């Protein structure tokens, strides 16, 4: 069972583009050893374990345009929830499965930027898997549970504030 989890994690690592690269939805995969972001492998391994333990639902694999559209819909929903909760932007988000960097920016009116080159230097950061984002938005996983499981990482000094904001936005 552990070998299977390790294989899944290594496969996910190979799909994580680096900063300034195209994402996995573009089907262009440079050297996988240049593609990692600090903490992304930990999130990938935790996600594989959570899926394996039925703590997070396994998602159907979607690639290309269909995968990008699904991720875009999730991120738009997250943006809407931030806005409804009155949470400010300044959040860079990495979906570790595809390597898709996105950004929520603004104060009263939030804007979602997809396919950004990486995190904005002053942004709070959020690393998570598609399965974790789906579960958070569906209400089957709280942000506290996601952090405990390791399927979400909020690195940096602003991580606690972002956790609080996610709690407000997701109602968990």
Annotate each language-model stretch with its function.
Residues 1-7:
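Positively charged n-region of N-terminal signal peptides that target proteins for export
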Residues 7-18:
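Bacterial N-terminal signal peptides
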Residues 20-172:
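Feature captures hydrophobic
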């Amino acid at each position: 069972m552990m070998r299977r989890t390790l294989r899944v994690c290594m496969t996910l690592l190979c799909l994580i583009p680096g900063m300034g690269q195209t994402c996995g939805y573009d089907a262009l995969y440079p050297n996988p050893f240049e593609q990692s972001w600090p903490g992304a492998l930990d999130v990938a391994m935790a996600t594989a374990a959570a899926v394996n333990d039925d703590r997070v639902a396994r998602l159907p694999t979607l690639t290309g345009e269909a995968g990008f559209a699904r991720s875009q819909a999730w991120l738009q929903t997250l943006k809407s929830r931030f806005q409804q909760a009155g949470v400010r932007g300044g959040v860079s988000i990495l979906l570790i499965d595809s390597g898709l960097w996105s950004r929520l920016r603004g104060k009263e009116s939030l804007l979602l930027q997809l396919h950004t080159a990486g995190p904005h230097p002053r942004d709070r950061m959020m690393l998570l898997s598609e399965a974790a984002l789906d579960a958070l938005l569906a209400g089957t996983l709280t942000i506290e549970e996601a952090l405990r499981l390791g399927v979400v990482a909020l690195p940096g000094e602003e991580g606690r504030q972002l956790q609080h904001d996610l709690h407000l936005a997701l109602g968990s």
